């Protein structure tokens, strides 16, 4: 076991505080509409320019191991806030730095760290309740656009794209952000259910120019196993031919004589047909086939349910207004499923999302939910250079998470004003001793830090501005750092999602309280390199 180095009490906290300051000072310059950029060296490729707090935090590793412990803990604040709310990472870092600084002073003055922590927790709980009570529900597209614009550092185009995407695919819809091949940023919306499987044979193509299959009002056969035997398929094919409608087959695979017969019939014009592989794998495939069945009002044909393919009739097949099959994906538009069945399935998937502990499973369940409930929107971010595209993509990602958070828990005045207004709720809190009261005072001072930092980054005096905001009793009165004017924050579109502000404060307080109550630090000593053996003689005799 490697030897360890240990530091105690004030010495330990001082080292940690230095690490916290180094990381927080690098992150906090990005806060607000006039926040600065941070340039990060990459071991290969061009340097990265970003205004995203968590991206800066993740890159910082300090040489001094004790200082690095402090930096790593604050990095954890930024990462946790990013995971839960997707934005507000810089605010969380600024709050953490302020609480640690004030808390360390109080501990150095001889106060009980555990009572300080209790006081901090009391204050945070009171502020969280206040934010929830004051949050205003997001109702209009304009408000969604404003949240997106603020989170993308004042880029109105990003706000507009996000509002448009959410309007088209709904709040449950999936919105993904990709890098564009061109200099323009564009929005593409896929309505209906799309999955990443294309046609099994190019001979199925009906639109040769676009190389895709387009069917209006087709029947959809949903089968769980491979189809290779033609005899099983014949009854269904004959029934579909008589109906005069096209047929789309979704199965694990279609091969051998079954595929050959379908292709020949398609080429001769006797049958409008196309076959695609079922999406997903294993149990997830079963679930996705069931989703398609519910969306189209059909049945997933499975031998587990005792249904044989030769006994299938037209009433068991799904229907849709339109199906488009390309080389690599299939889109089902306007399925004929019963609304009540689709809603029940959506509720079931939502319950699974709540229960799952795996991030991967949650992501896949959310994709399934979006395909049933709304659709999929893709924002392709363009720019003149690769560096610009990456920087813009960071901002769009932040804005996307912020808009989702706003829809979830509502909005509060931005620019750090919601936290400043929460100072009032700390006045009447009951405490058991003066140390707990000091804990509340620590939070009272710390929640002014984000507003002060936004103003400082804009080149003004934070203390003067915060004083003026607090003099005015109006809840939404604040300071527009972009223009340097005092305005009604909500009316001016300077708003934050309540969830982002809440998460930033809770995460910052949680980790900061742990740092304040730390009494010893243990790190591994670097291994000393063994001395090299002496060089042998040259062997030359004189």
From Swiss-Prot:
> What EC number(s) is this enzyme filed under?
5.6.1.7
GO molecular function (one): unfolded protein binding
Kindly state which keywords UniProt assigns to this record, in alphabetical order. Answer: ATP-binding, Chaperone, Cytoplasm, Isomerase, Nucleotide-binding
Q: Name one GO biological process term.
A: protein refolding
SUPFAM superfamilies membership: GroEL apical domain-like (SSF52029), GroEL equatorial domain-like (SSF48592), GroEL-intermediate domain like (SSF54849)
One term under GO cellular component: cytoplasm
The catalytic activity, as recorded, is: ATP + H2O + a folded polypeptide = ADP + phosphate + an unfolded polypeptide
The entry's localization annotation reads: Cytoplasm
Q: Name one Pfam family in it.
A: Cpn60_TCP1
Q: Could you say which protein family the record assigns here?
A: Belongs to the chaperonin (HSP60) family.
Instruction: Please state what the protein is called.
Output: Chaperonin GroEL 2
Q: Which organism is it from?
A: Azorhizobium caulinodans (strain ATCC 43989 / DSM 5975 / JCM 20966 / LMG 6465 / NBRC 14845 / NCIMB 13405 / ORS 571)
């Amino acid at each position: 076991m490697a030897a360890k180095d240990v530091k105690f009490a004030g010495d330990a906290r001082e080292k940690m505080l230095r690490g916290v300051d180094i990381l927080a000072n690098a992150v906090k310059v990005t806060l607000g509409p006039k926040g600065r950029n941070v340039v990060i060296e990459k071991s290969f490729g061009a340097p990265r320019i970003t205004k995203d707090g968590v991206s800066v935090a993740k890159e910082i590793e300090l040489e001094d191991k004790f200082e690095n412990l402090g930096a790593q803990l604050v990095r954890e604040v930024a990462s946790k806030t990013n995971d839960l709310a997707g934005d507000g990472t810089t605010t969380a870092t600024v709050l953490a730095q302020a609480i640690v600084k004030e808390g360390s002073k109080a501990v150095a003055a001889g106060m009980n760290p555990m009572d300080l922590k209790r006081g901090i927790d009391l204050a945070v709980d009171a502020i969280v309740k206040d934010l929830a009570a004051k949050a205003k529900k997001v109702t209009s597209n304009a408000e969604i656009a404003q949240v997106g614009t603020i989170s993308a550092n004042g880029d109105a185009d990003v706000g507009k794209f996000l509002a448009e995407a959410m309007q088209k695919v709904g709040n449950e819809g999936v919105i993904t952000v990709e890098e564009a091949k061109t200099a323009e940023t564009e929005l593409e919306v896929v309505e209906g259910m799309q999955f990443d499987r294309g046609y099994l044979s190019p001979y199925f193509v009906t639109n040769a120019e676009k190389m895709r299959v387009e069917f209006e009002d087709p029947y959809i056969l949903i089968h769980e196993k491979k189809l290779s035997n033609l005899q099983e398929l014949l009854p269904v094919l004959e029934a579909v031919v008589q109906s005069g409608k096209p047929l789309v087959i979704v199965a694990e695979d279609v091969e051998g004589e079954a595929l050959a017969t379908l292709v020949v019939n398609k080429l001769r014009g006797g049958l409008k047909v196309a076959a695609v592989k079922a999406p997903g794998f294993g149990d997830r495939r079963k679930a996705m086939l069931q989703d398609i069945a519910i969306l189209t009002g059909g049945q997933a044909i499975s031998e587990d349910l005792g249904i044989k393919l030769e006994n299938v009739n037209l009433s068991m097949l799904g229907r849709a207004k339109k199906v488009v099959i390309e080389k690599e994906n299939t889109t089902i538009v306007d399925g004929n499923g019963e609304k009540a069945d689709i809603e029940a399935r959506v509720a079931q998937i939502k319950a699974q999302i709540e229960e799952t502990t795996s991030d991967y499973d949650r992501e896949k369940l959310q994709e399934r939910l979006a395909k049933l409930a709304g659709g999929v929107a893709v924002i392709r971010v363009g720019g003149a250079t690769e560096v610009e595209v990456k920087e813009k993509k960071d901002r769009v990602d932040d804005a996307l998470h912020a808009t989702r958070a706003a829809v979830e828990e509502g909005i509060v005045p931005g620019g750090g004003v919601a936290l400043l207004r929460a100072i009032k709720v700390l006045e009447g809190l009951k405490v058991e001793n003066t140390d707990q009261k000091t804990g509340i005072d620590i939070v009272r001072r710390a929640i002014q830090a984000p507003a002060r930092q936004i103003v400082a980054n804009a080149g003004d005096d934070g203390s003067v501005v915060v004083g003026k905001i607090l003099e005015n009793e109006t809840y939404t009165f604040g300071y527009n750092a972009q223009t340097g004017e005092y305005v009604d924050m909500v009316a001016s579109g300077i708003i934050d999602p309540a969830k982002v502000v809440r998460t930033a404060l809770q995460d910052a307080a949680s980790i900061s309280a742990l740092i304040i109550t730390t009494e010893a630090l243990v790190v591994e000593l670097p291994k000393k390199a063994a001395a090299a053996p002496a060089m042998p003689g040259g062997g030359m005799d004189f």
